[in-house]
Curated annotation (Swiss-Prot):
Gene that produces this protein: 1
Highest taxon, organism lineage: Viruses
Source organism (scientific name): Escherichia phage RB69
List of residues binding dGMP: 10, 36-37, 70, 137, 144-145, 149, 157, 180, 182-183, 186, 213
Protein name: Deoxynucleotide monophosphate kinase
One Pfam family hit: DNMK
Role description: Allows the synthesis of deoxyribonucleoside triphosphates necessary for the rapid viral DNA replication. Phosphorylates dGMP, dTMP and 5-hydroxymethyl-dCMP (hmdCMP) while excluding dCMP and dAMP. The phosphorylation of 5-hydroxymethyl-dCMP represents the first step in the replacement of cytosine by hydroxymethylcytosine in new viral DNA genomes.
Keyword entries, A-Z: ATP-binding, DNA replication, Kinase, Nucleotide-binding, Transferase, Viral DNA replication
Catalytic activity, reaction form: dTMP + ATP = dTDP + ADP; dGMP + ATP = dGDP + ADP; 5-hydroxymethyl-dCMP + ATP = 5-hydroxymethyl-dCDP + ADP
GO molecular function, one term: dTMP kinase activity
Amino acid sequence: MELIFLSGIKRSGKDTTADYINSNFKSIKYQLAYPIKDALAIAWERKHAENPDVFTELKYEYFEGIGYDRETPLNLNKLDVIELMEETLIYLQRQYLPINGVNILSSLEGGYSYLDIKPYEALREAINNINDTWSIRRLMQALGTDVVVNLFDRMYWVKLFALNYMDYIGSDFDYYVVTDTRQVHEMETARAMGATVIHVVRSGTESTDKHITEAGLPIEEGDLVITNDGSLEELYSKIEKILR
């Protein structure tokens, strides 16, 4: 089973490439961002139940970008976001994998869970330093990078990938495709594991999003490049030439 890591900025055709591989090859598709979206969706649902006036209804699939523009502004202040992020960290800690430096306490009455003072203060400072308009996309960036990677465990999302990948070693799939490589340490892991690295590039798609996860990754010797400068059929043909 060949391990493939895809990289590309928004509107480069990276997601289209991933979908084509998943539909036309015997492959597993893995999103590094899936646990981020899952945790935010579940945390939002819980906060909506507590305070529907602030955390208005957002369907689970909206966090996947299905039927919703994830850059739509949300009417949240920084305290709202801190509360939401605390809920996501508790969910990740219990449902996925413990996060280094994140300690969770429970109240004696009612079993209410909350972050210990040290991780809470780190979270509060990080969110208070963000002055962007909040949206689902910005919440994803905040949780994935500004909070988990920068504050607690740089390799957390990579560890979750590795656990999933190990489950498929020895399977009869031909490809295991990581579809959303956005950070240097993720790509360094890919190369260390002997993965095939494919960059999908398209002229005229420079990102206006200044967050580090939307900056794009450098192309290094040995990487493959798909230049998406034509029709869908031409893109599919280029994918076929690489994988067949």
